[in-house]
């Protein structure tokens, strides 16, 4: 799923029921996608090893924007080794309560 919807600025289709259980890399999947705000909290991401820049928002030298703010508390990220810039610039997302995500210091 690496860079699958990168730059698809208006993409907001309901992909909540996708089977992603065999996905190992999600790098930049929703990078620079400003409209995406679908609940994907039920995704089985337990096989994913890299989530770098999944929700990163950066364009024309400016960080920020986007509306993604869904509950990802049920995500099993125990196999993830890279969350670098996962939510960088995703100003609406509030990961404060997601202690299992916060363990990765370079996430934001």
Please name every model-derived segment.
Residues 2-102:
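Negatively charged
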Residues 103-108:
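A short, hydrophobic C-terminal helix/tail in secreted or cell-surface proteins
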């Amino acid at each position: 799923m690496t860079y699958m919807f990168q730059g698809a600025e208006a993409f907001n289709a309901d992909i909540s029921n996708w089977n992603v259980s065999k996905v190992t890399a999600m790098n930049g999947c929703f990078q620079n996608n400003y409209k995406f705000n679908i609940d994907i909290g039920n995704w089985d991401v337990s096989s994913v090893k890299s989530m770098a820049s999944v929700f990163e928002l950066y364009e024309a030298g400016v960080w920020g924007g986007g509306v993604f703010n869904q509950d990802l508390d049920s995500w099993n990220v125990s196999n993830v080794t890279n969350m670098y810039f996962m939510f960088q610039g995703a100003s609406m997302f509030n990961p404060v309560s997601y202690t299992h995500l916060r363990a990765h210091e370079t996430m934001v």
